[in-house]
């Protein structure tokens, strides 16, 4: 199973990959079905958003354990420096905006005009492993789809499959996108408290301070 291309450069071909969210008994809760025809058509015309208003790639149907389609994931570009991920789930469209913010990477989740959650990731990779923190407002989204989107996002954007080099990589990352304004710096502090926000920021700092012993 080969990786997707990096959607940070949302032009080009992508390939098959099946992802799954399972329970403790390894039974599938949700899994993806790659929309080959739709993805091929979208990738065939660079900058198709100029004509259609939106270019959607890396489209995957989300199926439940009974093989019923219950949602979709995809990456969408609507203009120069206007990109987002989209979750279709239970009749809702959840827009997911990525921002590189120095030592951390955040994805802000919106239901319409309202921010409902945030994914936070230190820009540190140890032994090809990434770590994510998820904060969602109560009753704003089903936990299984939030967890499954994180798997999809990680594979799409931070895939390390096939890499055998172990160690630690750190970097500072800044993104320049017209949707950067969707990032609300005080979202966690305002909705989960000052102490939780400080815990998250300390987690980011500790990730950079920790050094792998040689």
Feature names for model-found ranges:
Residues 1-214:
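Intrinsically disordered, low-complexity proline/glycine-rich segments
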């Amino acid at each position: 199973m080969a990786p997707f291309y990096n959607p940070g450069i949302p032009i080009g071909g992508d390939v098959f990959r099946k992802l799954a969210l399972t329970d403790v008994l390894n039974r599938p809760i949700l899994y993806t079905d790659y929309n080959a025809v739709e993805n091929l058509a979208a990738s065939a015309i660079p900058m198709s958003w100029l004509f259609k208003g939106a270019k959607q790639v890396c489209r995957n149907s989300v199926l439940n354990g009974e093989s019923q389609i219950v949602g979709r994931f995809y990456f969408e570009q609507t203009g120069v420096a206007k990109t987002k991920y989209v979750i279709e789930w239970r009749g809702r469209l959840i827009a997911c905006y990525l921002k590189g913010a120095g030592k951390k990477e955040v994805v802000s989740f919106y239901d319409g005009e309202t921010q409902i959650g945030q994914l936070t990731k230190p820009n540190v990779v140890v032994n090809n492993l990434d770590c994510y923190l998820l904060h969602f407002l109560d009753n704003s989204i089903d936990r299984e789809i939030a967890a499954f989107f994180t798997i999809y996002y990680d594979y799409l954007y931070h895939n390390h499959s096939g890499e055998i080099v172990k160690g630690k990589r750190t970097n500072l990352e800044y993104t320049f996108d017209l949707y950067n304004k969707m990032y609300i710096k005080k979202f966690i502090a305002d909705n989960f408290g000052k102490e939780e926000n400080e815990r998250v920021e300390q987690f980011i700092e500790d990730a950079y301070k920790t050094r792998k012993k040689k």
